[in-house]
Amino acid sequence: MFAQPYDHSFNDLFNQYVNMETSAADGKDSALSDFDQLFPLDSLSSDCGDLPPTVSTPKRHQSPQPWSNDWSLQNDGAAVDHFAFHDTVHPSAISDVNLNNFEVPSRPTATHALSTSPSTPPATPRRKPTQSALITPKSIRHRSPNERRSHLRKQSFSPSLMRSSNLSKSRMAYPEAWAQQIQNFSLHSSEDRLPLSPPPSDVLIQHENMPTEHIMNQPRDSAEMPPQYDARLYHQSPSVSCHRRTSQCQHASNSTTLITKLFHLDSSSPSSADDMFSSSHSSDPHSISSWQSDPLHASSLSFTPDLQGQDSQWWSPMPSRVAQQQASYLESPTPVRTTQNVGNQNDIMQGGLMIQFNPSYDMSADHSFSSSNMLPATPQKFDTSFTTSQIHNVSRSPSLSPKAGTSPRDIHNGSISKPTHRRTHSRKLSGQSMNAPKPAKASGSSSRGSNKSVSVSFVNFTAHDSKKILTGVAPSGSSKTKARREQEARDRRRKLSEAALRAVRSAGGDVEALEAVLC
């Protein structure tokens, strides 16, 4: 019946309570046969391995002495108290404890459960825990209470499960309330969209995104559900806390068949809604402080991406679905609760792994949804808001990084004037650098008349070479030969003029009158 890696403490506890109910003098032998058909004790003891059930089976071995029967009953009760009211009891174990329709009588709990001495005959010696292995034919090994206590501490999943034991002491001992809680558990565990161990933010989002048809149709399957459960389940107040959801989802695949079979055996009348829902409110002070108990509004479901497998969507043309959506709108006033739900939606989007929207874009879309309930004009409003924001983004982006392909119609004149200034300035600089050697050539041509400046003009490896080479363009070979030939012609004319003047002087002529006539 059970898989091998399942909880051993759950098997032990269930086997104890089956045996305790058969040993009670109520005459419920039919229930015993039903339990033996459902859960044979051989398979339970063989599946458990190192941790077998710790109580002997009274069906297999009935002791002839009446005091030993009382002792085994008292021993079972002490072990029951030790298991049921321990600090770290599993919540699935508590649910199965209270399913079996018996209440634990008020008896003193013993710390060492298996070492209690019998009370009726005073001359009987103290029974040791190791002797109980000789009673059963299966030779079941017993463990000391300290080892069981350490094993239970290892099996506990989280410290938040400690509050469930106090629950079972005060209010959860009634089988009627637990029957309704098992029904509620079967309703919640039948969802296929819940993962095995989700983070708390994802659990909240998935419970928010539950479709309204799914929630409203599930309580109608059971005929004995009173009508006030529909409103409580539909509004989704935090009646079932976060850690109980995760623990129920973890053990839903293993213990669903067990719980449903036990639930069919127990035909009890349903209790009121206060017995069922007020206990989790009073026992879970640390459940979720930021989660408000407002009913789910449709605007909080608007932008979540988990709309893939759901049947009811915003644009569904079915008239029944539209009527249900409008009824959900009419139940609570919209303008008061839209702001709270928007805040909750932003918190959840920041906490979980979801796409974050711009707050202005988010608020505008929410108000367009909440102002017009199911009118066909809402997608038009939504599209216009989206397109206007897109246009603004397009007009802002070229001002930051202008491109050459953008037309000046979409861009302001001031944003494109600065790059043109820079381009003209760079062109002016390049023109000056190209025109820079021209004044150097002009200065060289103006210095041709003087004799001294010609010899100094193009000389390498001097202090003034940097200015001449870097500012102007270096002369080519043809220009050098041309300048050399011009220099040689000037030298020849100068020498000829000097020789003519010497000849005139040697002949006794007037040189100054000749220069005045020639010049």
Curated annotation (Swiss-Prot):
Instruction: Supply the alphabetized keyword list.
Output: Activator, Conidiation, Sporulation, Transcription, Transcription regulation
Q: Note the PANTHER family from the entry.
A: DEVELOPMENTAL REGULATORY PROTEIN WETA, PROTEIN ESC1/WETA-RELATED
Q: Name one GO biological process term.
A: sporulation resulting in formation of a cellular spore
- UniProt biased composition (Basic residues): 419-428
Q: What is this protein called?
A: Developmental regulatory protein wetA
Q: Which domain of life is it from?
A: Eukaryota
Compositionally biased tracts (Polar residues): 155-165, 301-315, 389-400
- Signal peptide residues are none
Q: Where is this region: Disordered?
A: 105-165, 270-294, 301-320, 325-344, 389-452, 470-495
Instruction: Give the protein's function.
Output: BrlA, abaA and wetA are pivotal regulators of conidiophore development and conidium maturation. They act individually and together to regulate their own expression and that of numerous other sporulation-specific genes.
Q: What induces it?
A: A huge increase in expression is observed between the fourth and fifth day for solid and liquid cultures.
Q: Where is the composition biased (Low complexity)?
A: 108-118, 435-452
| The keyword Isomerase belongs to this UniProt entry's keyword annotation | no
Family per similarity comment = Belongs to the wetA family.
